[in-house]
């Protein structure tokens, strides 16, 4: 992992150090912006599942507010026992990232290790908003 991406891993881990709660805040994400800034987001679980907010979505919102394109993404999951793992975005977050951070790379499982892949590779056949004639 490059030094800039390791910084993202550390930023996401710091969020979990400060805010982790089992079943409520288990994932943190950090995004590097083109201007060098790092924004973070935290998973916020709701009692009604669909109302929950993923860490990647929260961080992406912060990136949009910051006004600079996203270049790299790292997500970290903490298990109740304290172990932490890199985690790839869920399908909904992959859709959002495809719409708003398509030029970025995201860390995911690649074979037996982790590595950065282009966001469009997360969902190579994702839906597009434009209507297509049948």
Feature-to-residue mapping (PLM):
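C-terminal binding/interaction regions
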Residues: 1-22, 66-134
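Short glycine/proline-enriched turns and hinge-like loops at secondary-structure junctions
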Residues: 23-24, 53
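Short beta-strand scaffold segments in enzyme catalytic cores
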Residues: 27-33
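Short glycine-rich, polar/acidic loop-and-turn segments at beta strand-coil junctions
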Residues: 33-35, 43-45, 77
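Compact, glycine-rich, soluble single-domain proteins
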Residues: 42-57
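Feature captures the catalytic cores and cofactor-binding loops of soluble hydro-lyases/lyases
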Residues: 58, 62-63, 85
């Amino acid at each position: 992992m490059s030094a800039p991406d390791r910084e993202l891993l550390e930023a996401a881990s710091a969020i979990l150090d400060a805010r982790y709660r089992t079943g409520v805040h288990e994932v943190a994400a950090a995004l590097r912006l083109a201007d060098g800034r790092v924004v973070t987001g935290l998973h916020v679980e709701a009692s009604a599942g669909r109302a929950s907010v993923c860490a990647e979505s929260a961080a992406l919102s912060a990136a949009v507010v910051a006004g600079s394109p996203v270049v790299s993404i790292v997500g970290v999951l903490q298990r109740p026992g304290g172990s932490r793992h890199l985690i790839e975005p869920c399908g909904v977050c992959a859709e959002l990232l495809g719409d708003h951070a398509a030029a970025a790379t995201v860390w995911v499982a690649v074979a037996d290790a982790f590595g950065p892949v282009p966001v469009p590779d997360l969902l190579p056949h994702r839906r597009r908003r434009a209507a297509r004639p049948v």
